Amino acid sequence: MKMNDSSKLKKLYQIEEKKFAERVRRYEDIGHMMDTHQFYLEDVVLKKEEMLYKYISPSQGIAELSEEDSLGFDYEFIHKSVGNKEWRGGISTGEMIKVRKLPCTNLAHGGERNARTSSRMQKTKGGRVYACEIEGCNKKYTSSFGLKYHMKEGHSEEKMNIFKPYVCPFSGCDKKYKNNNGLKYHIKHYHDGQTA
């Protein structure tokens, strides 16, 4: 018997859950692993909330959805190239879940756009709504996961105390780098054709 796409994805999700559970059992530092697991659970909940708005039935409004109607697992997280596919399940009425695609406004693509172009265009169209609140940090992200990673990795004491002696010579640019190669790359890609 041939498995449909939804069954394959559920199976993949179950395999990943088992792998994670095995890592939890093998890990010696239970306290550290519980923190990691908490982050993992928060990420899954946030991702499901974001997906809920993408994968609703066309005949249902957001206000009509209940907790039972939410997806059983995160389709996009496991299978990135969903495109125009339809998935069965997840909605209590058994209706099809349609993955919405917005029409492309870029004429260079001939009105069509693939998944790679779609995400790139959304990121460059000012969709960065999650901003870092630390004073002096102007980083913005398209998802809460990017911001969460930035807060965890970008503002750690280890990262904050790195000596960066190579300063961009252009006025108004306060970028600093650990080595000369980083500065050269920055000047070539961000200040090409400008004079210092």
UniProtKB/Swiss-Prot annotation:
One of its GO terms (molecular function) is zinc ion binding. Keywords: Metal-binding, Repeat, Zinc, Zinc-finger. InterPro entries: ZnF-Chromatin_assoc, Znf_C2H2_sf, Znf_C2H2_type. A zinc finger (C2H2-type) spans 130-155, 166-191. SMART domains: ZnF_C2H2. One of its GO terms (cellular component) is nucleus. It holds the Pfam family zf-C2H2. PANTHER family: JUXTAPOSED WITH ANOTHER ZINC FINGER PROTEIN 1. This is Zinc finger C2H2 protein ECU03_0940. It comes from Encephalitozoon cuniculi (strain GB-M1) (Microsporidian parasite). The lineage of its organism: Eukaryota, Fungi, Fungi incertae sedis, Microsporidia, Unikaryonidae.
